[in-house]
Amino acid sequence: MSSVLSDYTIGGVKIHFPCRAYPAQLAMMNSIVRGLNSSQHCLLESPTGSGKSLALLCSALAWQQSLSEKPVDEGLNKKPEAPPSCSCACHSKNFTYSDTNLDTSPHFNSPSKPSSGRNGVSTPCQDSPEKNTLAAKLSAKKQASIHRDEDDDFQVEKKRIRPLETTQQIRKRHCLEKDVHHVDARLASEKRVKPESPIGKSFSDRKDSFQNVDGLCSRCCCSAKQGNNQEPANTVKKDHGGQCKRPKIYFGTRTHKQIAQITRELRKTAYSGVPMTILSSRDHSCVHPEVVGNFNRKEKCMELLDGKHGKSCYFYHGVHKISNQQTLQHLQGMSRAWDIEELVSLGRKLKACPYYTARELIEDADIVFCPYNYLLDSQIRETMDIKLKGQVVILDEAHNIEDCARESASYSVTEVQLRFARDELDSLINGNIRKKSHEPLRDVCYNLINWLETNSKHLVERGYESSCKIWSGNEMLLNLYRMGITTATFPVLQRHLSAVLQKEEKVTPIHGKEEAIQIPIISASTQVVLKGLFMVLDYLFRENSRFADDYKVAIQQTYSWTNQIAIFDKTGVLAVPKNKKHSRQKIGVNALNFWCLNPAVAFSDINDKVRTIVLTSGTLSPLKSFSSELGVTFSIQLEANHVISNSQVWVGTVGSGPKGRNLCATFQHTETFEFQDEVGMLLLSVCQTVSQGILCFLPSYKLLEKLRERWIFTGLWHSLESVKTVIAEPQGGEKTDFDELLQVYYDAIKFKGEKDGALLIAVCRGKVSEGLDFSDDNARAVITVGIPFPNVKDLQVELKRQYNDHHSKSRGLLPGRQWYEIQAYRALNQALGRCIRHKNDWGALILVDDRFNNNPNRYISGLSKWVRQQIQHHSSFASALESLTEFSRRHQKVTNRSKKDEKCTKDNEPTLEVACLEDSTFTSVSESSHQSPENSTEEAEVCVQELQCPQVATKSPSVASHGVSRRKKSDPGLRGESLQTMKTEKNEISRSSSPTFGKQTEPVNWPIFNSLRRHFNSKVKNCTPVLKSSKNRAPGSSTFNKTALPLTGNCVPSNETADTSLGPCLQSEVIISPVKIEATPATNYSKQVFCCEKDLLPDTELSPGTEEAKCPSSNKAAETEVDDDSECFTPELFDPVDTNEENGELVETDRSSHSSDCFSAEELFETATGFGQK
């Protein structure tokens, strides 16, 4: 994380940003804070690479923390007024209290029932002298928080400003306030009088004093408050300290891999220590050896927890070791934002289950990361105990949120699954186990099976080996009514299902007290069937069948091939069929599908409860469908611009191939050989033009397979492989297989030999197009062939189009055709977003289809804003290829030059005069500073010198240098500071360091150093500066002695480094005689070198104790930051293995109090050169 924080105050919220924010980031943070402050929903599109993740995290967490900084409600410190006189028995004059001056809360309606007031404890009398002491109250609140239960969400708050109240309401409020202050004063009094007495003991004492208290009468106004523990919907909850209770932030994204990317971004921020957790499935977090290797991990996990086979999960019993935030954050490596893999490693080490640990951490977490189907699916919310009321929901990568919402409210079950559930319920009934609850559930399965069998005989043929029959939601309600499942009986069925899932049952023996016994329950697979059915039935019956019209119910029959069951002859011998083909049978599979066609059904559970919903992605366009489809009013919408310049991207449409044939990727044209050959020739031409990695996206796997077969037949595939390594995305398969294939692609680009990079042919909506990062050389061009419309013959697509057409006027939905096209644009934008992943990236976007040229108003309007603004239409492929060649050649030349300079720096590094550190840790070649202090009392001078080979007769022009006074070696904080920096250095091309220059290091056997060693024996290029100490410089004689920067303390004494310029260094045979250049006085320091937005003030010393540099918070400074885009730098946008020098420009380098003061040689060289020219 960058240590140079920029502070922005937006909407009254102070946001600590890890760098200078881009205008797109400022716009996003402004929209998010506005939405959170006003409880409005946000729809935000920001292109990939514009720092969207950092803006989301920083703005949301800053707003959340700002709530806890608000002052305590004045009502807590105000003495409650005496309530009006009451004639009830509990307030009569003859009513006496115990001699401990305890006042019984009016919330007690039985002698033994604890108070339902704040913290559930009784209160002292009003005459207690400590009741008005604020310090006592605060101390008591802190003490009470230790023993507080989990029911604080239902405590009634007091507002600073209240509307007019009736007399009865005033009396109720005073009674409540009285109770609240009694709690605080009592705890404070006990802490002062008896500090050694635990709270639990005092509570038991108070409980004993309640035994003689009669219940409240019905006339008492306090009793009217007794059953009113619910808060109004528009109130803000308070925590136990009287401050606003901070809403949790549920941060949902599409995949677990994207969660890992988000947590890495969180580590870069000032909010990296926020309490957090990550929810995941057992596939990602289970560590039990018997479960990990099992196909159905959930079922195996439940068996272990139930102890069915005499075994239990010892990992589950160790959850308490790390189940709270305080314990977790004090463990090694978990104090900052962590990833699920780190939790899994820690759980395996401590024998604690990571899956259940993550669930336990929800309670105290401020931010919860999870796949967003965890928030949309009601079953998963119930399983994970996710409560969204009053919380903040952020859904990143939400371009697929509509499909996910529909799937969350849909359910499919096969006839085989229903029969298995029926048989299992039968066995439990026959065993006389909870017979009354199991019988109604078994009847549901029986009725559905009979209905399936009856209607499967009247299915309509649809396509090859498939048939179906469809009912509307209202028609299905009539069928359910005939089965006995109605609005009145369904709640009873729900109670029966809850009962059969209870593992224990309380029984009372004849002679003995009540005890719990273990009861067998239904298997996990049967639970899934019944819970899924009850979920869709709940939607169908909810609110007088409000959502019934949003469903379609279908019986689908498909066929699958299976091996024939073994047949034995009369003698009992296995009869083997003569023809092996006859050993396989075709079996029909009937499935009952409840399809939700309206994503607003699933979103209704969220929209009615949460405080704010934030939908964001790089490819939300077009935005107009989200509000109508999700049933959510997005009052705040944003389409942010990209952070790159126009010269960094080439966007063009191509309507014809190299031979001039039109390319229209409709179904009719893609079947022709002419189209297939023309696309292949176009792809080959682009591969010969653009180097490194190229991605090609096709509309479907079916077309990919057709093209592959055709190109192999014609020899075009071989031609492609002669230029690049060609990889095709597989359909389905294991995740590990796909990851291995992807690694082959990366390696072909990184370690290219005879071939120039790699070509990856993928499919829109596939694995490659979703969430993968192809930055820099991994994707210098993205080619999309056609427009990826959904399969028009798909039954669900057809039903959805009909549904939208039917409700377009009544509900404001988009017509079916517009909805259909929008699905294609989103998939296309997602594929195009694989290229240009950060500010300094460059690449080409090639859209192959003549429909873009022929009807741009229709087909271009659906693309992302930053693509629409730069798209160019090319009338012929030749003109497009010419323009693409010039673009690629220009940028590739700059990239190659940067890489060459970087390689020169790395190759010459061992010949530099460097002071080796006492520690043998590997250091970064490109970022290490090369200092040789003479002794602990002298200051090192930074000298920029020119390297030359001894064989070169002429010297290059001298470059002016300047000295910078440094801190002394004896500073105790420098050694740890340097070591910490070396561990966190990026872009490491490591080299071993020697304790002295006089010693030769052992050769390194790494492949990269073999090439470096070969280069050391050749001519050394004059491109890398060195840092040389000044032996005779007196203290304070530095040219710039007013500005002191910290110096690492791991340097050798001067007597060990004398005359090292003539000694061998890393076995190099080249001796370089340094040429000292006189320093030229200069006072105009570059802020890019010293990472300050302003020039350093005189006599300013940057030391480990110095606070982190921050951007000015004034309005003028803020305007300057917005206007100056050239200096914006976001760590999120740079891959850890990339270097800033590749882009040919000097980027802000972060300096921190805990990092080394090392400057890269390139920075010093460029800075000194600039000074010399002025």
Curated annotation (Swiss-Prot):
Catalytic activity: Couples ATP hydrolysis with the unwinding of duplex DNA at the replication fork by translocating in the 5'-3' direction. This creates two antiparallel DNA single strands (ssDNA). The leading ssDNA polymer is the template for DNA polymerase III holoenzyme which synthesizes a continuous strand; ATP + H2O = ADP + phosphate + H(+)
Region (Disordered): 101-160, 187-208, 923-1001, 1102-1155
Annotated ranges, domain Helicase ATP-binding: 11-445
Chief location category: nucleus
Cofactor details (free text): Binds 1 [4Fe-4S] cluster.
Residue ranges with Acidic residues bias: 1138-1147
Protein's job: DNA-dependent helicase and 5' to 3' DNA helicase required for the maintenance of chromosomal stability. Acts late in the Fanconi anemia pathway, after FANCD2 ubiquitination. Involved in the repair of DNA double-strand breaks by homologous recombination in a manner that depends on its association with BRCA1.
Complex and partners: Binds directly to the BRCT domains of BRCA1. Interacts with the CIA complex components CIAO1, CIAO2B and MMS19.
Name the record gives this protein: Fanconi anemia group J protein homolog
Gene behind this protein: Brip1
